[in-house]
């Protein structure tokens, strides 16, 4: 992803996260400042280029959506894992609490789906919705089996499949 593309993705994310609710605004800005490599955006932009999905800023919108889904899952994971630090900074749940963190993660997901509805590609919207659903199911599987030392290989592979592979599969569509 060239610098121009990264800037476009960042601008799209920032513009879509504007909120009249001050706490939502603070939390999303804080989370975005923690950085990240934007690898998912890079992969999305490359796949969009290969699939010729670049009319207007459709590729940038899709890359922003993928990043928003990722950010939301990180917020939810930090609550589930009681994480205090992510990327060298305090997590949202450490600063603002679990309830706010979950709700802001949900806010990011809703913003992603708003963008995809505006795009009008129902097939892609369905794919992102299915991916989000399967990520959530994978997290529940992980939570359900996290205390089991003798976790079955099949259960572990199902969990990984839901939480990671489905997200990567989305990028290749």
Language-model segment annotations:
Residues 94-114:
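Multi-pass membrane catalytic core of lipid/isoprenoid biosynthesis enzymes
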């Amino acid at each position: 992803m060239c610098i121009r593309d990264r800037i476009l993705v960042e601008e799209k994310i920032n513009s879509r996260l504007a909120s009249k609710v001050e706490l939502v605004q603070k939390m999303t800005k804080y989370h975005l400042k923690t950085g990240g490599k934007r690898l998912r955006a890079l992969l999305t932009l490359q796949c969009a280029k290969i699939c010729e999905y670049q009319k207007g800023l459709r590729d940038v919108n899709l890359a922003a959506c993928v990043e928003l889904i990722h950010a939301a899952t990180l917020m939810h994971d930090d609550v589930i894992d009681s994480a205090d630090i992510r990327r060298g900074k305090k997590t949202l749940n450490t600063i603002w609490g679990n309830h706010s963190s979950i709700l802001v993660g949900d806010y990011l997901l809703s913003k992603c789906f708003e963008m995809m509805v505006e795009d009008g590609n129902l097939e892609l919207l369905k794919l992102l919705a299915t991916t989000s659903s399967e990520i959530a199911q994978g997290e529940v599987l992980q939570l359900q089996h996290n205390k089991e030392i003798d976790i079955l290989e099949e259960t572990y592979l199902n969990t990984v499949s839901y939480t990671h592979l489905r997200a990567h599969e989305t990028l290749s569509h």
